[in-house]
Amino acid sequence: MKFSKFFSNVQETPWYLDFLNPVINEITAYKKLLDFGTGTGKLIQILSTEKGTECIGVDTNSEMLLEAQKKLKGTKTKLFKIKPDANLPFKNNDFDYVTICSVLFHLKKNSVDYALIEAQRLLKDEGKIIILTPTGNGNFLTLSKNFFSFKNLSIYMWFYATRNRAKIWTNNNYLKHYANENKLNYKSQKVMNGFAQLEIITV
């Protein structure tokens, strides 16, 4: 099985919905949203069908986008393949939200800055960049206490695969420093019983 198909299946599990819910709850219905690093498209599938959000998803991975096309069949959501660190093909000040889930903590600093600068360009006044990232906090026991079920077995793979990079990202507070340096409003909260962090920058 290709990783893109495996990841698409993971996105259908109960724990993954728990992971995405904090982002979903931040989105006002019938707004326009860009999902940066959309992967196989679960977030924008939910938002387009449940909140009437006008969604565009972008990703660098063709196989992920092929899986997203299957998931998004029958919706008006649009998908674009992009090159790393290239300007996005959208006009300035056109989106209410830019969402970035489980992406930035994998990237080098220059790529993180690129994503944030592009997000600022694309957002309307008072638009929001919403970033969701695993924290790397917790352990096998706390994970089992909160999420154990046979449908959630993939959460253990997710936790151990992301833990080291996630801890570094969480401890560095990069987005908080970025927002302060650029005089942007920033807030954050731990979500998903402390296993993830939601960070919001308002431009």
Go through each PLM region and give its residues.
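A short glycine-rich, Lys/Arg-flanked "PGG" loop and its adjoining helix->strand segment in the class I
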Residues: 113-125
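Class I SAM-dependent methyltransferase SAM/SAH-binding core
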Residues: 40-86
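Conserved class I S-adenosyl-L-methionine
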Residues: 1-28, 30-39, 42
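Conserved beta-strand signature within the Rossmann-like core of class I S-adenosyl-L-methionine
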Residues: 127-134
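A conserved beta-strand element that flanks and buttresses the S-adenosyl-L-methionine
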Residues: 99
